[in-house]
UniProtKB/Swiss-Prot annotation:
Species of the source: Chloroflexus aggregans (strain MD-66 / DSM 9485)
GO cellular component: cytosol; membrane
Protein name: Acyl carrier protein
Functional pathway: Lipid metabolism; fatty acid biosynthesis
Name of the gene this protein is made from: acpP
Entry keyword set: Cytoplasm, Fatty acid biosynthesis, Fatty acid metabolism, Lipid biosynthesis, Lipid metabolism, Phosphopantetheine, Phosphoprotein
Amino acid sequence: MASPEMEERLRKIIVDQLGVDEAQVVPSASFTKDLNADSLDLVELIMSIEEEFGVEIPDEDAEKIQTVADALQYLETHQSNE
């Protein structure tokens, strides 16, 4: 399970990058369907996540990150391996 600090950091990135209300950023929220992100938004979001958390997300993994929960799970898995 992701730490509250990790969730808060991710939530801030999503709010800043996508210009959405913080209340909309829930684990089940789809970046494209619920938060209205387009493909450019997603690229910028992934880049911001990489920078904030010090991880590199390959394109094939980035394509699988569709929801807030997906992003948290990815970060949890890949930060613990460092």
